[in-house]
Amino acid sequence: MKILILDDEMFARQELSFLVEHSQEVDNPEIFQAEDISEAEKILFRQQIDLIFLDISLSEENGFTLANQLSQLAHPPLVVFATAYDNYAVKAFESNAVDYIMKPFEQQRVDMALSKVKKLSQLTTASDVEQAIPKKASVELLTLTLSDRSVVVKMQDIVAASVEDGELTVSTVQKTYTIRKTLNWFKSRAVAPYFLQIHRNTVINLEMIEEIQPWFNHTLLLIMSNGEKFPVGRSYLKDLNEHLTM
């Protein structure tokens, strides 16, 4: 797979290149780097790039400028936006991006993006790929209002939501946010069948379960992909078993 990383910061390019090279999702990736759109265009002209990691805020340019030009190529690459800003998510998916990852980059999150790219690259026609890429209408986003700002997170990136002492903690694959909301508020926005309540104060993303262990009183302990651990309440065991093949 030929991958182009466009970022005006050399450290960010090197960091992302390192994570891609060490990912289990791609074999022997051929990685190209560019610090501006002009340099990226030269690489795109010479190479048939399969994937571009695209920063949004470049020194004097905007990554969306290049993203909008890619559709003119005979074989446009898939796009993953890689940025320090969390307020461009909706616009990113409007431009048919496969994923949207945040700085500082983490191996697990890069792996998730590459896994999506790998699945899309196995599709045979352009129309298949276009239908598989999330569109604005189908991308589930959740706005979390913090004390100093609001952040937008993708529901699929949420690991769990739990309530303690009147505060709701929402854990994603990258960060944890605490807001003044109830668990019912989150449940009303969580999309089935991915989210399931496993305790009176906890809802988890089923796709983020990494390991299941026996627990006290014939219950279970869920180990999530980000390392968090959540006990399953006895009254929720039946519902969990119905959603999992055990």
Curated annotation (Swiss-Prot):
Residue ranges of every copy of the Response regulatory domain listed in the record: 2-118
SUPFAM superfamilies found in the cross-reference section: CheY-like (SSF52172)
Post-translational modification, as annotated: Phosphorylated by LytS.
Subcellular location: Cytoplasm
Main subcellular location: cytoplasm
UniProt cross-references to Pfam families, sorted A to Z: LytTR, Response_reg
GO cellular component: cytoplasm
Keywords: Cytoplasm, DNA-binding, Phosphoprotein, Transcription, Transcription regulation, Two-component regulatory system
Gene3D superfamilies noted in UniProt: 2.20.25.10, 2.40.50.40, 3.40.50.2300
Domain HTH LytTR-type, first and last residues per copy: 142-246
PTM annotation (4-aspartylphosphate): residues: D55
Molecular function (Gene Ontology), one example: phosphorelay response regulator activity
Top-level lineage group: Bacteria
Function, as annotated: Member of the two-component regulatory system LytR/LytS that probably regulates genes involved in cell wall metabolism.
Protein name: Sensory transduction protein LytR
UniProt organism field: Streptococcus agalactiae serotype V (strain ATCC BAA-611 / 2603 V/R)
Lineage: Bacteria, Bacillati, Bacillota, Bacilli, Lactobacillales
